[in-house]
């Protein structure tokens, strides 16, 4: 193993395994963004709250552009297991059904760090009023 490979292996062992799942909203029907927000608030948030092996999940969206789930897992094995099972059924997932298409990206990543700001984390099923 080269010194670069050794450094990379050592470095990634101390970081958190993540996964990004992204759908395009460019051709999604009108009302899709609201339907996604309602689904997250009414179903998906509860499904992932307290999920074993998951550190946290965020749902992000740019109206008319994309919707994504960002997951951070406790171990790479848990990330790999979730990625494998999700990928196998991605086309039938709730997000795909609401949007009308499969994800355009299912990508593992490494979360280097997370900083909690002075206002603290505000975990919520919805940030809309």
Feature-to-residue mapping (PLM):
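Short S/T/G/P-rich N-terminal loop/turn motif that feeds into the first structured element of a domain
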Residues: 1-66, 77-84, 101-129
């Amino acid at each position: 193993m080269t010194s670069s490979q050794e450094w990379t292996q050592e470095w990634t062992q101390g970081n958190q395994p993540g996964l990004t799942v992204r759908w395009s909203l460019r051709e999604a029907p009108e009302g899709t963004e609201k339907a996604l927000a309602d689904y997250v608030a009414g179903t998906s948030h509860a499904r992932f709250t307290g999920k074993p092996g998951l550190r946290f999940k965020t749902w992000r969206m740019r109206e008319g552009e994309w919707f994504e789930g960002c997951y951070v897992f406790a171990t790479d094995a848990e990330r790999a297991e979730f990625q494998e099972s999700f990928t196998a059924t991605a086309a039938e997932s709730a997000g795909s059904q609401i949007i009308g298409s499969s994800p355009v990206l299912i990508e593992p990543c490494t979360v280097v760090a997370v900083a909690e700001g002075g206002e603290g984390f505000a975990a919520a099923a919805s940030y809309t009023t």
